[in-house]
Amino acid sequence: MKSYISLFFILCVIFNKNVIKCTGESQTGNTGGGQAGNTGGDQAGSTGGSPQGSTGASPQGSTGASPQGSTGASQPGSSEPSNPVSSGHSVSTVSVSQTSTSSEKQDTIQVKSALLKDYMGLKVTGPCNENFIMFLVPHIYIDVDTEDTNIELRTTLKKTNNAISFESNSGSLEKKKYVKLPSNGTTGEQGSSTGTVRGDTEPISDSSSSSSSSSSSSSSSSSSSSSSSSSSSESLPANGPDSPTVKPPRNLQNICETGKNFKLVVYIKENTLILKWKVYGETKDTTENNKVDVRKYLINEKETPFTNILIHAYKEHNGTNLIESKNYAIGSDIPEKCDTLASNCFLSGNFNIEKCFQCALLVEKENKNDVCYKYLSEDIVSKFKEIKAETEDDDEDDYTEYKLTESIDNILVKMFKTNENNDKSELIKLEEVDDSLKLELMNYCSLLKDVDTTGTLDNYGMGNEMDIFNNLKRLLIYHSEENINTLKNKFRNAAVCLKNVDDWIVNKRGLVLPELNYDLEYFNEHLYNDKNSPEDKDNKGKGVVHVDTTLEKEDTLSYDNSDNMFCNKEYCNRLKDENNCISNLQVEDQGNCDTSWIFASKYHLETIRCMKGYEPTKISALYVANCYKGEHKDRCDEGSSPMEFLQIIEDYGFLPAESNYPYNYVKVGEQCPKVEDHWMNLWDNGKILHNKNEPNSLDGKGYTAYESERFHDNMDAFVKIIKTEVMNKGSVIAYIKAENVMGYEFSGKKVQNLCGDDTADHAVNIVGYGNYVNSEGEKKSYWIVRNSWGPYWGDEGYFKVDMYGPTHCHFNFIHSVVIFNVDLPMNNKTTKKESKIYDYYLKASPEFYHNLYFKNFNVGKKNLFSEKEDNENNKKLGNNYIIFGQDTAGSGQSGKESNTALESAGTSNEVSERVHVYHILKHIKDGKIRMGMRKYIDTQDVNKKHSCTRSYAFNPENYEKCVNLCNVNWKTCEEKTSPGLCLSKLDTNNECYFCYV
């Protein structure tokens, strides 16, 4: 029973206890205006409809129902507003008992939200231990941590990654300067041209916090003024006698505490965003504080107004995790047909609304005058015919590629036994390799040699059948949790065909550490310490608020780091944003050549260009390699450092594009080429800056380097520096020790927990970071690292490593980081406009939902599921390719090789948190609600960009068939402009809909 959530529990969640109550209703949240219920159309009312339910619903649906869910909405592609299912259902209120139970508070999301009656805004209520995040689409992001009473605002109105604290009486949504406050804690308005915060403390206003709507006003308006009658002031919390330090007083009248409830009212009045925050007890108390913390932010008039309010809340109960996302349409003028298509994408759980919306239009019969086209980017619309032709062409790959794909398929079939359940889950033993497999293995490596351009099989001896089998088996064991398409990709790494496979990385490094010394004059071990200095504390007491003393660098304003959904202080993964410049810089392969220093350096400069608003353009690595002023004969075997990279571009003042002078490792060591007239100079108007004398750093002209060893007693500061630079510049260069650590079989998806060395031999790039829970149930963080060993290594060329590493390590895995200090002008001319659909639906990241889980993860309440239960779940989900060997995982004896299952291996201490995650999605418009539900098998599933389990079957009985068709053909369609359209073309019976995958 642990494996599946009860039907009763799901129904309680779906109906949200406001229309059909499962156990009665708590009266919390009605102090100070409005019942803590969902009004304004946010009742998850009777939502009958098609048997499959919402097009946005997860195909898995709810347990005990049909395979595809049961929370009705429109069918895919149905865009007729007259359809009662596609346009939503009228909300009907049902009278129920108001009796509260303790179990009710534990098993449902307690954060309640409701539209305001007379204002464009929302009221949110709940207990003080519940957190949530709100978006005023498309401009404002509000993160509410009620446990610490911490509310932060971010905005896309200004290209900045800095948040502004609600607690601070000063600051700006657009302006980044220190602001001195009057002693009374209230600032005057500084002019309408900038966003200004005004802090006030005032009784709550009934009119602005009325939560009733036209569809259900009576349920909440009756209790709209119960808190305003209180009169006494609440004192600030005092420090206990055992407190080691005196905490500074909070600049808030309302501080959340256990057992209390909160109310946040957010609304827009003319050009002012107003936030009101109130904390109150569960019972009415005449002595309770009646003061409300109010902040007002002036917002510039923009072409695009606020159109939607999206709120995300999270709840964990008995091992089941709920994410609830409600999208309130507040000013949406999008045509009903287009809104239906887009809302279907939202309700499916698809993160890439634009791609899903684009697919929905592509699968329809072509209509050049379709009004929905204007909500896509101009580039996509102009390529519609080309995109359709892309999937209609029947051109096969060349013969060698076709035969290689066929050979890989044959080997994967032959290397596994079929068990009693008819599942291919057991690897065969060496002595079980038959003649047909031996022939296939040699044929496979012969074909691979023909298509490989890395030089692997040209420079090292090819193995025999047994060598190849052992190499492949080792690869499969280290990647036991990969799906079939990922494994097929990894079989294209030519290293698996080597006789001595460990020789593969010998000439794939190439970092030579420069001899540099610390300038002790500028060495200051305390400058990057997170603890506040006495001066900071004194200034804070005087009302001087430093927005962020360590993150505010003089060049921060010159970078476009406004993509808060994909990169912020908590997590950063721009690779998940398919429209981002950085995500379009494809992984490269340095080949059999010691040139990692070039690839890490050029990628760092490429991401800096991206953050300056330029198009994604790769720099020629071969130009840098061959324009070296020293000897060229042994260039591939020497190695160097990023310092030389900077010296070369300063000497020549020119950097051509990769397309001008393509890289081939065999050409490294040739003479520096003559620049052609048509070549593009990517260093045009670029300047290398002089050293900045940063604390704890090695400084030189054009760069700053930080050694992790110098931060041994304060690794948090080292981490903070890297995060800041990644947010601003897109990446940093990192030095690591690869020898005896990283091989061809290295797993990139698992978080590796590795020690470092006192020296380094390889240069890579840190491009992002995130959070995970390790095998001990501890919250941890990792770096996302990009390598230059090609897309068939690691996780498509990337890997993850724990930020801090094991506690016993003498050295961190990241030996050093290097940041270029260069001056490139901002490029505002070629910045592409995003699709207009993002004015109405949030541009979301899978990392956002995973981080929402992580922030609320309770170690004490964790309930990880067994491998056996996971296997059963995967079968229920209909995905036949999730994991090889789950049935017998862990059955091998300690110290002995297991040939009966694919066991996890390596140094990873990460666990895929086997908890069930249900994502409930609601779209509320004109007093009507549409719903969808998505089920994830674990927290890693939450983090995926695509999922074939979102396939839709027009007949529920064909759901498994649709998922299988998607899995089998995903590799074929993955790189197409519209994978959903590509899959649809392969569905000759027209039984499935793939725009949601």
Swiss-Prot record:
GO MF terms held by the record: cysteine-type peptidase activity; kinase binding; peptidase activity; serine-type peptidase activity
Region: Disordered, residue numbers: 26-107, 181-252
Position of the signal peptide: 1-22
Propeptide: 843-886
Keyword hit for Phosphoprotein: yes
Site feature (Ancestral active site) residues: S596
Cysteines joined through disulfide linkages: C445-C497, C567-C572, C581-C610, C593-C636, C627-C672, C755-C809
Family: Belongs to the peptidase C1 family.
Assembly information from the UniProt record: May interact (via C-terminus) with PTKL (via SAM domain).
Protein name per its UniProtKB record: Serine-repeat antigen protein 5
